[in-house]
From Swiss-Prot:
Its main location: cytoplasm. Substrate binds at residues 8-10, 161, 192. Pfam families: TIM (PF00121). It comes from Wolbachia sp. subsp. Brugia malayi (strain TRS). It catalyses: D-glyceraldehyde 3-phosphate = dihydroxyacetone phosphate. Its EC number is 5.3.1.1. Belongs to the triosephosphate isomerase family. SUPFAM superfamilies: Triosephosphate isomerase (TIM). This is Triosephosphate isomerase. Involved in the gluconeogenesis. Catalyzes stereospecifically the conversion of dihydroxyacetone phosphate (DHAP) to D-glyceraldehyde-3-phosphate (G3P).
Length: 233
């Protein structure tokens, strides 16, 4: 599997910004071997936009039901129809979601033909209490589906948007915990990934990719991150 680079735009960016971004990415894709997944807001999801083969589109959430009276929600089947192939699930910024709901969403996404990127990670209190491995293992047991293909994103809550990143050894240890439960599924890292630290992160043992937040909104900065990954691989 190629190194997976996922851009989570969160609630940022307009449709015109997205179209312009994808156009530039298509122009550069021949020089890129990594797998790129861009996850814009729902309003920018592509429809019939042209994509080169190593670029995919993802969403930032889906409901675990296929249809029904769920105001403001969107189903996995709807995302698939819009051209999505990936969906981020269980991100810590989506508050009040239970582990059980995240697992149901993951199972529904797989049934609908999407590849879920399922987030796990400890908060600051867990980290300071040396409970990181315990928390992540419990989340794996509670959130991850038994069958189907998916990717796990280790994204420590305390690292998101703070500029702080765990050591390479600490990340590698958590990857080992996740893979011991998931039969060697692919694990990516998210949490303050930037141009300044991507070269270092690329050296982590068994890391299959990265989940990038705000650093993915500017095309030139994102492209430089991709270039750094290409050098490492």
């Amino acid at each position: 599997m190629s190194f997976l680079i996922v851009a989570n735009w969160k609630m940022n960016g307009t449709r015109s910004l997205f179209v312009n971004f994808i156009g530039k990415l298509n122009d550069k894709s021949n020089e890129i071997t990594s797998k790129l997944v861009i996850c814009p807001p729902f309003t920018s999801l592509p429809g019939n936009i042209e994509l080169n083969s190593n670029i995919s589109i993802g969403a930032q959430n889906c409901h675990y039901k296929k249809s029904g009276s769920y105001t403001g929600e969107i189903s996995a089947e709807m995302l698939k129809e819009l051209g999505c192939t990936y969906v981020i699930l269980g991100h810590s910024e989506r508050t009040h979601e239970t582990n059980g709901e995240i697992k149901l969403k993951s199972e529904t996404a797989i049934e609908s033909g999407l590849h879920p990127i399922i987030c796990v990670g400890e908060n600051l209190e867990d980290r300071e209490s040396s409970k990181t491995k315990e928390v992540v293992e419990y989340q794996c047991k509670s959130r991850l589906p038994i069958h189907g293909e998916y990717t796990v994103a280790y994204e420590p809550i305390w690292a998101i948007g703070t500029g702080h990143v765990p050591s390479n050894n600490a990340i590698a240890e958590v990857i080992e915990v996740i893979q011991s439960y998931t039969s060697k599924k692919h694990v990516i890292y998210g949490g303050s990934v930037s141009l300044e630290n991507i070269e270092n992160l690329s050296n982590i043992l068994n890391l299959s990719g990265v989940l990038i937040g705000s650093a993915s909104l500017d095309f030139d900065r994102f492209h430089k991150i991709v270039q750094q990954v290409e050098k490492a691989y």
